[in-house]
Amino acid sequence: MGGPKKEENPPGGGPTSLFILTEDNPIRKYTRFIIEWPPFEYAVLLTIIANCVVLALEEHLPGGDKTVLAQKLEKTEAYFLCIFCVEASLKILALGLVLHKHSYLRNIWNIMDFFVVVTGFMTQYPQIGPEVDLRTLRAIRVLRPLKLVSGIPSLQVVLKSIIKAMAPLLQIGLLVLFAIVIFAIIGLEFYSGALHKTCYSLEDPNKLVKEGESETPCNTDNILEKATGSFVCNNTTSMCLEKWEGPNSGITSFDNIGFAMLTVFQCITMEGWTAILYWTNDALGSAFNWIYFVPLIVIGSFFMLNLVLGVLSGEFSNERNRVERRMEFQKCRFRAMFQTAMVSYLDWITQAEEVILAEERTTEEEKMHIMEARRRNAAKRKKLKSLGKSKSTDTEEEEAEEDYGDDGYLKTRSKPQGSCTGFWRAEKRFRFWIRHTVKTQWFYWFVIVLVFLNTVCVAVEHYGQPSFLTEFLYYAEFIFLGLFMSEMFIKMYALGPRIYFESSFNRFDCVVISGSIFEVIWSEVKGGSFGLSVLRALRLLRIFKVTKYWSSLRNLVISLLNSMRSIISLLFLLFLFILIFALLGMQLFGGQFNLPGGTPETNFNTFPIALLTVFQILTGEDWNEVMYQGIISQGGAQKGMIYSIYFIVLVLFGNYTLLNVFLAIAVDNLANAQELTAAEEEQVEEDKEKQLQELEKEMEALQADGVHVENGDGAVAPSKSKGKKKEEEKKEEEEVTEGPKPMLPYSSMFILSPTNPIRRGAHWVVNLPYFDFFIMVVISMSSIALAAEDPVRENSRRNKILNYFDYAFTGVFTIEMLLKIVDLGVILHPGSYLREFWNIMDAVVVICAAVSFGFDMSGSSAGQNLSTIKSLRVLRVLRPLKTIKRVPKLKAVFDCVVNSLKNVVNILIVYILFQFIFSVIGVQLFNGKFFYCTDESKHTSAECQGSYFKYEEDELLPKQELRVWKPRAFHYDNVAAAMLTLFAVQTGEGWPQVLQHSMAATYEDRGPIQNFRIEMSIFYIVYFIVFPFFFVNIFVALIIITFQEQGEAELQDGEIDKNQKSCIDFTIGARPLERYMPKNRNTFKYKVWRIVVSTPFEYFIMMLIVFNTLLLMMKYHNQGDMYEKSLKYINMGFTGMFSVETVLKIIGFGVKNFFKDPWNIFDLITVLGSIVDALWMEFGHDDSNSINVGFLRLFRAARLIKLLRQGYTIRILLWTFVQSFKALPYVCLLIAMLFFIYAIIGMQVFGNIKLGTVENSITRHNNFQSFIQGVMLLFRCATGEAWPNIMLACLKGKACDDDAEKAPGEYCGSTLAYAYFVSFIFFCSFLMLNLFVAVIMDNFDYLTRDSSILGAHHLDEFVRIWAEYDPNATGKIHYTEMYDMLKNMDPPLGFGNKCPNRLAYKKLIRMNMPLDDELRVQFTTTLFALIRENLSIKMRAPEEMDQADMELRETITNIWPLQAKKMLNLLVPPSDQLNKGKLSVGKIYAGFLILESWRSTRFGQLDSGMPMLELQDASRHPSQESLTGADAGHLHPGHSYMNGHRRSPSLRHNGSPLARSPSPRRRGHQYIHHDIGFSDTVSNVVEMVKETRHPRHGNSHPRYPRGSWSASTSPARSPSPSRYGGHLSRSKRTQLPYPTYGTTSLCQRSRSPSPARLQEMRERDRLGYGIDMGVTHVQHSYPTLASRRAGIGRRLPPTPSKPSTLQLKPTNINFPKLNASPTHTHHSTPHSVHSLPHHRDLLRDPRDMYYSSRERERDRERLRDRDRDRDRDRLHEYDLRYEYRDRERELYERERDREREVERERLEYIAPLSFEQALAMGRTGRVLPSPVLNGFKPKSGLNPRHSDSDEEDWC
């Protein structure tokens, strides 16, 4: 078991065991063999199971008594211990104890085993005694079987998904724990010691006075001093004293942090929280308590605990996908292997056949035989394929039969010969006839009707039915059974058994009929029925076959069957879990539940009862009650609190984790099923389309034959219906759009034409902009009036006044209705008034109100009409629904709910059918068995007569009570009652009582005996698994999926998904954060600021908060005075420290900047509150009644919230939390409407019921006597707190309130209570609260999805880091700082510091944000570009980017119409910002990419004597300095230096339109000659590089005039002043302490750095051919091309979506190396941005521009001679890096190449260089053919320092 696999520890060389036995030792070898021998493992497992059985058989008696069996079983303990000891010893010998890898105690299971064995020995010695009963630890051994379980694949999915979910679950656990701590501390401050006062008798001060059956906390004796809503003792009989231990024996309290946390946890699980709320109300008054409890339930239960569900379902679907993909891959691999083998085999056979056929000796007959065999094989293969298709569903009826043609069928039958031939032929015909009959429609419907009638017969059975009905049903059962049996046999005969059993429906029929036969025999022999025959009702599901829901239902069934293994494995896991906890519970609590009122029904005394108790806790119902009993049994609140851990773990792991996996499976399957259905529907649509097209072709060909026309109409229908749908959608859209609607062109009510002035007036009024607003106001006022009514005193003055208001409101609504009818017409034409649902509702409400007023006025026969009037007036509550239509977003949520209901319909039908089946089984099992006598000693109605004495606990004399024989409130006497009972059970409320009653049920008309038939619990367990665990979850899942689909459907038109939308949402709302910093660094303010923002200070404050939290947790009830004072002064100290922090922050930031940060405001409020609180504690005790300052204590707990902003994961969780709250307002509004409507109905119908004691459920805490009370009661029901009891308390026949002005003998309440509560629970539990779950699952899906996908939760980090670079929140930073920032941000948001520069450049080229004049990027633009690039939002090939931009702008305008006006140009910069003479990030980084690529070639890394261009080693400076430094401005278009009258062709002044780097803006010119933006950028980037080794000399070449050309100059360009003329000469004269930048203008670089060429360049430098320093240059004139004057520059084509690389040969351009983050130091030399020469220009010598041919020739000769002279001396220097095989040949080729280069003429421009070519060098390892044919080939391998060859693996 615990041993590792054999290969883990290779024998021989391994470590010794126990320092003695080596790997080769025979003892160790044998022990190793034994522990790895499978029979040994099974033996150990069997021992474990036997041990579990022994533990389960024990019965625990009170007082440590033992039964005879238990004593015998105890003796087995030694044997078990012995076996486990032997196992442990063998393993220790074989594996070693602990010191080395894979040794015994390095395995978690082995540690557990060892622990159990050691503790087992301890228990064998009696002197340890029963105090430390360590046998409990033996239950841990039950975990061992889990090891084998992990081998089952489907269980692995469940287990793995739970284990994988543990990481996010722990995050959520932290959040929940944090919430619990905060609420517990608040509870500790407010409620500590509050629940210890109760009423004591005046006669006996030690005797408690109860209210009803339980004690109640009290507030005071003096009725004048009492707080509103609190409880006051009756001062004639009792007094309020503070000496009670508290409710639930003192366990439920806030007396110290432990009790408080347990109480808060209990509230979060929504069990028993109302009791705590009511107790605190009694003790302290009801004014403010709800403010504590309602948020606790909403945040704790609805939100935090639902997160668990979201995480689990996400993980489950991920894990299942993973497993499915793996299986799919394995199948594919096997299939491929099989196919290759098969194909080769078939080829071999076919070739053999060909040979045989070709042979001369093969006879014709043999050939025919071979051909026939081939034909048969082909046919068989075809049939197999078709069968495979139809079989996949496995739910079709006898579809497959058609495949078996008559011939095949006949051939399979053996035909007997002889005299019987005629008989067999007749039999065959008869069989065919029957077969056709069975398949007809009428036979199908006949069977369905029979099933329906049978179901009706089953359903009419009820308790106390007349004997004739019993007899009729008895015989009907036989008749139906006979009919169904004959149907089964007829089908079997007609189809043959094989085909019959291929249909799953038929298999099901057969099982049900067999079950019914068994049941009939059983009831004859033994009596009693199981109700199995009702399973026939499931056959009604066949009706679905004729409905449109069939495919979706079938797919759901398929999907569920597919995940059956997961479900079964989950159930197995659940069973193991229950088993372990039941055994553990028996060890801990067995025989201990001996309470004053006797042993409770839930206990751990025997194994079956323990299992049921654990199952009950697992369902979450009344788990707190069991926990109270457990704690009390172990010594009460003082000693037994540690035992609460058992129950908490059980609830957390069982209820919240395992049971939520059911929902996870359901969500997953439904999504799966819906995909299947959608795919099928698409297929059907496609087929229809194809048919339609074929038909059209036929019709064209045949000129519309009659038949074809009919078919055509039929086929066209679907597309028409589609058109209709689209029209409807369009109509709806039109309605939503603003602006006046045109008048309908029909006459209204046959009288008013469209031109009629009355109608036009009505139309004008209805369409007034404020008309709807006015109606909304009236609706709101009317709703307030409804809520303000007094339901008890109907004729009170308040009600009379409100009645007059009601007349006014009804008048307004009537006028509105009449105006709309005049405008729209009544009903006859499209668009008329009653054609819309909302208008019908309006009309009904108005008419009913008018009718009820009519009755009121007439006053005739008031008595009989009262209920009618009341029901008519109740309809007024529908008025608030009128607002739904008027608020578009609310209507969207409402539509979503309605749609999810529509989706649920088909499941709802199945659900009701299953509910019905269980109800019928319940009626069969428990019919008439739920009666009891109020005197428990009597067991029949005959005995239950007269009176009996009832003894109360504290009373001296018994009470006399009447004996009454009555049924339980929930029973199974008829199907309707059974369905109600099961509905209550399924909501999980009060089901343990129903379970106890069922197990105690004996026989019909007899009383209960406790645990009479424990096996009846199986019915409930099965029901729970089918319903709450499963069906309800499918329901919830459907609503969740529909809700999510609705949200996604809205976005489909815009072609962006949900995640993209939430990211864009964030971008639109995001603003840069301001981070203040004092300007003067020498001030005191700056020093304070430095302290306040430093990390140590932050940590110090964190530590303070943590210690402060611990201090708050140290408080407890009844603490000593000294202790209390210490706490008070320490608290003051903390308050002082926090005050100092706040003061320091105000000094450091200044008042104005301090208040800009919301956290600072929060701190200030907290500090001020704490100071007031401290002062009040010290000085304010004199006059306690003046003002209630209790709320000030909240500020102590508020500091904890500051902890939340520290952790990254917690920050993200919280951020998402807030986001989900933002998504909820309309959902909450809808829920509020539901509550409002139900509360008003409740007030009207149940408001006058008399308030009773606690047992009655309608009490002073819990009633409908005011609107607020009604809403609280409904909120309680929504959390599921004992709603069935409230429903029973509202039924007809309840006593009326004393103030209700009812006639004597008149009763209140109504039978409507059933419908009212059931519908409310249905809407609330299934619909509304699931919207919460849907929203949460939507928002928190990032917890389980791939973390590399960018989500909105990452973007907060961008805002935070941006603030570090842009502390003043200007919204702009320099592009170099932007690069740094993105490198500092981790992926998926930024690039990360490990991202290769080249990949970063490519991303930036695609992002391409525009730059302003100071080369800064904008905040919103950068964030949006980042999101767009990361999530590929409309990113396309470069040439399509313009179109994509336009589409994206349109999408943004559609989805965010309001924000788009302001933000659109920031989000998607318009083309003119990227085109017209403006720089963009894409252009700059395209230049850097070229440099980077050049650097990675062999010539970028030359270590020769040539001037080496190295990486600029400049560190980043703040943007303010870099932009305002004296010499700043490398790429600043504005800093061009003028020389004389000439101006530089800088970006500012050039009119050439620039191309946008990543996307082209073509304007009709096919060839546009040059691109200033990009080329200027490249040239300037190049010039930024520092010349290091060889500073150039100031003298120029004597032969050439002084008029150098910049990188951008060419004969066709405007004249350029010297870039370094004036400025550099000045810098040289002033002897600056830093080296100046030399030019690296491309034109002055060689074509190919061959050794000779390098030498030539050096010589040229010496002679002064290069750029001169400090010398004024003379301008030379030359002809300018007309096209240039026109301002048409060559455009640079786009970068593609995957940026291609520049096809400038790396050997052609000597680029300098550049810094990864191209930031410049502030002592850089300014220059203007010039443009790059045409790519042809790059290939020529700069001097060629003004050489004569003779001069050129002379120079060439001179250089050639010099080369030859010096080659011998210089060659070894280059041979270090380049090897030439043939020196002579190399020299010859060099000469030839130089000749060709020099002679080449540049007569015309060629087509522009494409960006694919231009950036070719950005691609790694891709080398293009060199234009210089000199035999130099760059090395394909890159220098390891600069290698980006694996760049795609980064980022």
Curated annotation (Swiss-Prot):
* Residue windows of the III repeats: 762-1049
**Site feature (Calcium ion selectivity and permeability) residues:** E271, E621, E989, E1281
Which Gene Ontology MF annotations are present? calcium ion binding; high voltage-gated calcium channel activity; low voltage-gated calcium channel activity; voltage-gated calcium channel activity
The residues covered by the EF-hand domain are 1353-1388
Encoding gene, per UniProt annotation: cac
Q: What is the species of this protein?
A: Drosophila melanogaster (Fruit fly)
Stated membrane topology is: Multi-pass membrane protein
The residue intervals holding the I repeats read 25-316
**Listed name of the protein:** Voltage-dependent calcium channel type A subunit alpha-1
Looking at the record, which segments are called Phenylalkylamine binding?
Answer: 1306-1348
A biological process term (GO) from this entry: chemical synaptic transmission
The compartments listed are:
Membrane
Compositional bias ranges of the Basic residues kind: 1589-1600
